């Protein structure tokens, strides 16, 4: 029997990009990487678990901030090389900058313009020395 994880086209580092979207509004919240273990645990625990390339370890979204992403649905694209996670974003903050989405800048008139407000000061969210989930 074929394992569902074998259907994914992992990159040379054994990773696949994962896009988290709000399951109610469809808004793109963030993009992160998943390895096989992260994807398997995400399915098993019904919460987003990513692979932190900078720290070289699993990253359970919300483990420090409390901003957990509860999984509602998982989709695989037509090329089997991108995952979409339809999630409920607990606390309404997905970005380490304290915003709802990591995609808070819009290209306008040749420049990037910040269009989404900071909902909570990142220093109040994360412990000292921890800059980014």
From Swiss-Prot:
PANTHER family: HISTIDINE BIOSYNTHESIS BIFUNCTIONAL PROTEIN, HISTIDINE BIOSYNTHESIS BIFUNCTIONAL PROTEIN HIS7. Catalyzes the hydrolysis of the adenine ring of phosphoribosyl-AMP. Homodimer. This is Phosphoribosyl-AMP cyclohydrolase. One of its GO terms (biological process) is L-histidine biosynthetic process. Belongs to the PRA-CH family. Zn(2+) binds at residues 78, 95, 102. It comes from the Bacteria. Keywords: Amino-acid biosynthesis, Cytoplasm, Histidine biosynthesis, Hydrolase, Magnesium, Metal-binding, Zinc.
């Amino acid at each position: 029997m074929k394992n569902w994880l074998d259907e994914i086209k992992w990159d040379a580092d054994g990773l696949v990009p994962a896009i988290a979207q709000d399951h109610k509004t469809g808004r793109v919240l963030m993009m992160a990487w998943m390895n096989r273990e992260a994807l398997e645990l995400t399915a098993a625990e019904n919460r987003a678990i990513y692979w932190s390339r900078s720290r070289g370890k699993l990253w359970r979204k919300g483990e420090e901030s409390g901003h957990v992403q509860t999984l509602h649905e998982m989709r695989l694209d037509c090329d089997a090389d991108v995952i979409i996670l339809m999630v409920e974003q607990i606390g309404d903050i997905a970005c380490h900058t304290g915003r709802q989405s990591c995609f808070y800048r819009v290209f306008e008139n040749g420049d990037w313009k910040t269009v989404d407000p900071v909902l909570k000061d990142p220093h109040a969210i994360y412990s000292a020395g921890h800059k980014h989930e």
